[in-house]
UniProtKB/Swiss-Prot annotation:
Subunit: Homodimer; disulfide-linked.
Cofactor remark from the record: Binds 1 copper ion per dimer.
Enzyme class, UniProt record, top EC level: transferase
Reactions it catalyzes: ATP + protein L-histidine = ADP + protein N-phospho-L-histidine
Binding positions (Cu cation): 65, 69
Induction remark: Not induced by ethylene.
Protein name: Ethylene receptor 1
Molecular functions per Gene Ontology: ATP binding; ethylene binding; ethylene receptor activity; metal ion binding; phosphorelay sensor kinase activity
Length: 740
């Protein structure tokens, strides 16, 4: 035990001092341990502190210092070597951390000294941001005022209201003493005071347009400060006021006003401007700010746009009023034209009936007289009467057809017919006339043409008769050739009509007919008027040629209705001409058989016993027409009973009558109603006579009405003996006849 050195010798200690050191070290340790906690809290909460790692070093230093003081509590009494080692280690660590922290502070202190400089920099930045925010707020305020002013300006399209609203809103927004608008005069040489803020009816002051201040303002799109003593700034008297307010002026473009004939604005051929003048309150230190000038400039542009819109509105309203007036006038003209067309149609209908009735008598009696024994001189006179009457009847038909073509009421009568028979019919009609003039006429119908086609047989015959008839009429000698074939696309082109390009299909084709003669020919300058109604070329319109000038005009319209084209070629006078027309025809479905019977051949028998004992009832209100028709029927051997009214016809008709001829235009009970009554009287078909309308109306409506009431046929006056003979033959053979 004596050799044991477990306890090192210690200094004797004062108990009171020891107690105070104990307490002091304890509280020092508590303080050292609490400060790192506070630093940790600061590091977590501070997002912008740049030296967090320095705070960590401070924390470690303080913790080690606290640990040193805490360990030191055990060194006041006797303690072991272990406590001494721990104490020494703690002090070494504290010394190391303290030195590192001290070295780091050498580098940090300059940065900490620059914090003040940064603070000043940040303050300057903050002040600059405040100024920018103030500018932004000013711009927003200006924008709000602009939007408000724009809304007020555009709330109306009346230009006087626009200008007055602009001045009022600018005066209220900017606190103006006066605001005025100068407009150019009609001559454009002066500006006139048109609107002011304070004066209800401003006197029309004017200033010359060539003033330097005006040129200065007009040459810039910005608001310009001008002298309060300028002529355009003297808006109000300055009595009792010492310092006039600042004045600015800005131009207002008059956009596109040259396109609008505003009554009280000048007609501006070049770009001109109005001028807006704004005055701040007098006797005040207020000045114009930049944002206020920008506001004025924007408002001036908005006023220009609003005035342009107002001008457009005024022009559109004027155009609308003018259009309404024109529509009223056009509607009145249309009604007058419709009235005139109806009057013309009524006149033509009446004249058609009134002319055909005597023509019927002339042609019928002439044809009857022609079949009697006459001397050669008498026969020549009768033939002349008959030819002249037929020519007059043709002229009547042409006039009526042209009238219906022009008002669009004429429509094609589409049916299946024998195309080859049509060519033979035309050839047989024209050949005798050509023989008299010693003309040789040839007909060449291509085998590729279908025998039966779908189209308007009557109009096709009329076209061919007009074209071939003209060739015969205007040729004194030579040959006339008629050629017909299926048209190919390359053979129907006419350089004068490049838009006409026909295309055939499986059930339709185009037929080309070419009529070439060696007649008088045509002057090239007369070509354009050949298809004009009542017009003929000079070499053609000879005194012996005859004709009304309607044939080609009507033929052209018929060809157009058939989706075709017609043209004429001639090398000049005395060199003949070639007329070519192309029409579209349909191909019947199924077998190539006729859907309608062919025209029966004309009987060569001119005896009076063609229809011996055939009982016929004739009803015609016109006495002459009734007598003439009765004579025709009796000449053909018919047993005729004639009556003058529908009531008498209804009373006289019986089963013994085989045919009833009736005029459909009679007073009281007309022909259509009479046909219905006859159908009601004879319910059985074999007991009912055949009903045929004998009419002067050649329109399609008459035919449709007759079909509707059950008539078996329609015959157009005038009627000759041969025509009546053919009519009865076809009627009795087929029990139906509707003359084309």
């Amino acid at each position: 035990m004596e050799a044991c050195n477990c306890f090192e010798p210690q200094w004797p200690a004062d108990d009171l001092l020891m107690k105070y050191q104990y307490i002091s070290d304890f509280f020092i340790a508590v303080a050292y341990f609490s400060i790192p906690l506070e630093l940790i809290y600061f590091v977590k909460k501070s997002a912008v502190f740049p030296y967090k790692w320095v705070l960590v070093q401070f924390g470690a230093f303080i913790v080690l210092c606290g640990a040193t003081h805490l360990i030191n509590l055990w060194t006041f009494n006797l303690h072991t070597r272990t406590v001494e080692i721990v104490m020494t280690t703690a002090k070494l660590m504290t010394a190391a951390v303290s030195c590192v922290t001290a070295l780091m502070l050498v580098h940090i202190i300059p940065d900490l000294l620059s914090v003040k400089t940064r603070e000043l920099f940040l303050k300057n930045k903050a002040a600059e941001l405040d100024r920018e925010m103030g500018l932004i707020r000013t711009q927003e305020e200006t924008g709000r005022h602009v939007r408000m002013l724009t809304h007020e300006i555009r709330s109306t399209l009346d230009r006087h209201t626009i200008l007055k609203t602009t001045l009022v809103e600018l005066g209220r927004t900017l606190g103006l003493e006066e605001c005025a608008l100068w407009m150019p005069t009609r001559t454009g040489l002066e500006l006139q005071l048109s609107h002011t803020l304070r004066q209800q009816n401003p006197v029309g002051y004017t200033v010359p347009i060539h003033l330097p201040v005006l040129n200065q303002v007009f040459s810039s799109n910005r608001a310009i400060k001008i002298s309060p003593n300028s002529p355009i700034a003297r808006l109000r008297p300055l009595a009792g006021k010492y310092v006039p307010g600042e004045v600015v002026a800005v131009r207002v473009p008059l956009l596109h006003l040259s396109n609008f004939q505003i009554n009280d604005w000048p007609e501006l051929s070049t770009k001109r401007y109005a001028m807006m003048v704004l005055m701040l309150p007098s006797d005040s230190a207020r000045q114009w700010h930049v944002h206020e000038l920008e506001l004025v400039e924007v408002v001036a542009d908005q006023v220009a746009v609003a005035l342009s819109h107002a001008a457009i509105l005024e022009e559109s309203m004027r155009a609308r009023d003018l259009l309404m007036e024109q529509n009223v006038a056009l509607d009145m003209a249309r009604r007058e034209a419709e009235t005139a067309i109806r009057a013309r149609n009524d006149f033509l209908a009446v004249m058609n009936h009134e002319m055909r009735t005597p023509m019927h008598a002339i042609i019928a009696l002439s044809s009857l007289l022609q079949e009697t024994d006459l001397t050669s001189e008498q026969r020549l006179m009768v033939e002349t009467i008959l030819k002249s009457s037929n020519l007059l009847a043709t002229l009547i038909n042409d006039v009526l057809d042209l009238s219906r073509l022009e008002d669009g009421s004429l429509q094609l009568d589409i049916a299946t017919f024998n195309l080859h028979a049509v060519f033979r019919q035309v050839f047989n009609l024209i050949k005798p006339i050509a023989s008299v003039k010693k003309l040789f006429i040839t007909l060449n119908v291509s085998p590729d043409l279908p025998e039966y086609v779908i189209g308007d047989e009557k109009r096709l015959v009329q076209i061919m008769l007009n074209v071939v008839g003209n060739a015969v009429k205007f040729s004194k000698e030579g040959i006339i050739s008629v050629t017909a074939f299926v048209a190919k696309s390359e053979s129907v082109r006419d350089p004068r009509a490049p838009d006409f390009f026909p295309v055939s299909s499986d059930n339709q084709f185009y037929m080309r007919v070419q009529v070439k003669d060696s007649g008088s020919g045509i002057n090239p300058q007369d070509m354009p008027k050949l298809f004009t109604k009542f017009a003929q070329s000079q070499p053609v319109a000879t005194k012996n040629s005859g004709g009304s000038g309607l044939g080609l005009a009507i033929s052209k319209r018929f060809v157009n209705l058939m989706d075709g084209h017609i043209w004429i070629d001639s090398e000049g006078p005395s060199k003949g001409c070639t007329v070519t027309f192309v029409v579209k025809l349909g191909i019947p479905e199924g077998s190539n058989e006729p859907k309608l019977p062919l025209m029966p051949k004309v009987s060569a028998n001119n005896s009076q016993t063609d229809f011996p004992g055939l009982k016929v009832l004739l009803m015609d209100e016109n006495g002459i027409s009734r007598m003439v028709t009765k004579g025709l029927l009796m000449h053909l051997g018919c047993d005729v009973t004639s009556v003058s009214s529908s009531e008498e016809c209804l009373r006289m008709v019986s089963q013994d009558h085989k045919v009833v001829f009736m005029d459909v235009r009679v007073p009281g009970l007309d022909g259509h109603e009479l046909a219905v009554r006859i159908h009601e009287k004879f319910m059985k078909r074999h007991e009912r006579p055949l009903i045929v309308a004998l009419t002067s109306n050649a329109d399609k409506v008459t035919k449709e009405n007759c079909l509707r009431v059950g008539m078996e046929g329609v015959i157009l006056k005038p009627v000759s003996v041969d025509k009546m003979r053919n009519v009865l033959s076809k009627l009795l053979e087929h029990r139906i006849l509707f003359e084309a």
